[in-house]
């Protein structure tokens, strides 16, 4: 079975089940801004976790090279997220059919040409008018290294370097849309960063599945009708207010009000993919792990081979920036679009 690059589902679910996803979203009630994780050691925090994507967004103005104040760009990307399921832990009763959706399981097998698929997480992303998601690749995992204990920018650079495929745990990601909105298209680059971008409208009851650890992707701006985006900062919450309405709250203050059809609601599903029981067991038993020290030594040796690093010892921050600049190359923006 040859691997596939992506698969699109239209429709994804029978309509009654799709409407139930909206009721589940409403029932969850409150959605916080996506909180950046931290790593509990000095090297892990020399840079913000997704410094690579954030700096590229500020530097370039995003996919359409829009120039705005840093504070505005931050509000545009302080979107809302909550987790519905983690491993076998169901945090939102009723999400189980989506968590074990057979069409996702079958497509994941095709994406990585691996027959064993283990659902890992289900989470919701909600963007309000004026928000977008900068083009990026997701944080991969390796045997022995993951985002809970290692810098996210390092994991991303490791994957883009191509030097650590032996240890990578393939992950398939599905993104499903419910209710729909104007704008907020899913953009992805299935032919690589130099290829043409593909866009999918955020239409109700549709989905796409692909390898988001490898394929650059993002979310175009949700239509705002020229309305100014509210000053959304970490700590803000998107709260369901009943009768199809939502409000953004921060410190007891209501910053904005929206209705279904204005906000972009998506549910993401991620799963680990294994070739056989031995590969899965190697993850569980840590029998063939890569360490951070090993990863850094490998990257530094490769940088020297590329004549991008001398024999000197760089400060941690400078080394981190050198790694990001060399290995994580983003698609070019469309100037003047």
Where do the language-model regions lie?
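Catalytic core of Fe(II)/2-oxoglutarate
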Residues: 170, 181-336
């Amino acid at each position: 079975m040859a691997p596939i690059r992506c698969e699109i589902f239209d429709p994804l679910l029978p309509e009654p089940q799709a409407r139930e996803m909206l009721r589940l979203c409403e029932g969850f009630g409150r959605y916080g801004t996506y909180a950046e994780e931290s790593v509990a050691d000095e090297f892990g925090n020399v840079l913000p976790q997704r410094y690579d994507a954030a700096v590229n967004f500020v530097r370039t103005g995003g996919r359409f090279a829009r120039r705005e104040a840093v504070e505005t760009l931050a509000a545009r990307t302080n979107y809302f997220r909550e987790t519905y399921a983690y491993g076998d832990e169901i945090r939102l009763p009723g999400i189980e059919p989506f968590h074990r959706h057979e069409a996702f399981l079958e497509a994941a097998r095709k994406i990585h040409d691996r027959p064993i698929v283990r659902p890992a997480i289900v989470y919701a992303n909600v963007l309000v008018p004026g928000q977008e998601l900068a083009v990026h690749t997701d944080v991969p995992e390796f045997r022995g290294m993951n985002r809970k204990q290692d810098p996210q920018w390092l994991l991303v650079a490791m994957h883009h370097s191509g030097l650590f495929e032996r240890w990578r745990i393939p992950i398939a990601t599905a993104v499903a849309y419910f209710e729909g909105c104007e704008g907020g298209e899913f953009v992805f680059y299935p032919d690589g960063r130099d290829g043409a971008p593909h866009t999918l409208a955020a239409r109700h009851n549709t989905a796409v599945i692909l390898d988001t650890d490898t394929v650059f992707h993002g979310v175009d701006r949700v239509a705002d009708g020229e309305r100014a985006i509210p000053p959304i900062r970490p700590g803000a919450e998107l709260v369901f207010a009943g009768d199809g309405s939502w409000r953004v709250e921060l410190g007891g203050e209501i910053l904005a009000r929206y209705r279904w059809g204005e906000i972009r609601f998506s549910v993401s599903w991620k799963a680990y993919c294994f070739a056989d029981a031995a590969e899965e067991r190697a993850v569980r038993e840590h029998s063939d792990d890569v360490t951070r020290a090993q990863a850094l030594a490998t990257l530094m040796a490769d940088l020297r081979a590329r004549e991008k690093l001398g024999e000197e010892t760089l400060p941690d921050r400078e080394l981190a920036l050198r790694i990001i600049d060399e290995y994580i190359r983003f698609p070019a923006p469309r100037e003047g679009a």
